UniProtKB/Swiss-Prot annotation:
Reactions accelerated catalytically: S-(5-deoxy-D-ribos-5-yl)-L-homocysteine = (S)-4,5-dihydroxypentane-2,3-dione + L-homocysteine
HAMAP family: LuxS
GO biological process, one term: quorum sensing
Designated gene of the protein: luxS
Record keyword Membrane present: no
Xref: PANTHER family: S-RIBOSYLHOMOCYSTEINE LYASE (PTHR35799:SF1)
GO molecular function: iron ion binding; S-ribosylhomocysteine lyase activity
Cofactor remark from the record: Binds 1 Fe cation per subunit.
Binding site for Fe cation: 54, 58, 128
Family: Belongs to the LuxS family.
Name the UniProt record assigns to this protein: S-ribosylhomocysteine lyase
Keyword Metal-binding in annotation: yes
Organism: Klebsiella pneumoniae (strain 342)
Length: 171
């Protein structure tokens, strides 16, 4: 099995909240695709609650588009990580990390403005696979956590696992 890019960085040294360019690629037609690691929690120390991350998934996708789309950038998808420590965001374009961080903070401020659960988009049996598993309160706690701690930038060069370590891990 090939070694995925996300497993070549040292999770013990990641800061959170932080933005990291996880991958860059070009389509056959020359479009630039960038995948960002939006790390909400320090790996192996913190985790987002499942109801909160699910609600945030519904809110974050729209709010990030409001703040980041345009000027050569269009978000393709924002999806939670299985480890519940962050989200991956795939987009067309190559915005710098600070632009992404600023949009992320603005999106979190928008999450705090949501007044009740009925304002969560697609919160129904037809558009959500687990529509009863939501918590606006938990999503807003996560948003407050991001705003209070601010968003930093994680560098791939600083986080790269040395080849010796990868060999030691039998990868």
């Amino acid at each position: 099995m090939p070694l995925l890019d996300s497993f070549t960085v040292d999770h013990t040294r990641m800061e959170a909240p932080a933005v990291r360019v996880a991958k860059k690629m070009n389509t056959p037609h020359g479009d630039e695709i960038t995948v960002f690691d939006l790390r909400f929690c320090v790996p192996n120390q913190e985790v987002m609650p499942e109801r909160g991350i699910h609600t945030l998934e519904h809110l974050f996708a729209g709010f990030m588009r409001d703040h980041l789309n345009g000027n050569g950038v269009e978000i393709i998808d924002i999806s939670p990580m299985g480890c519940r420590t962050g989200f991956y965001m795939s987009l067309i374009g190559t915005p710098d990390e600070q632009r992404v961080a600023d949009a992320w903070k603005a999106a979190m401020a928008d999450v705090l403005k949501v007044k009740d659960q009925n304002q969560i988009p697609e919160l129904n049996v037809y558009q959500c696979g687990t529509y009863t598993m939501h918590s606006l309160e938990e999503a807003q706690d996560i948003a407050r956590h991001i705003i209070e701690r601010d968003v930093r930038i994680n560098s791939n060069d600083e986080l790269a696992l040395p080849k010796e370590k990868l060999q030691e891990l039998h990868i």
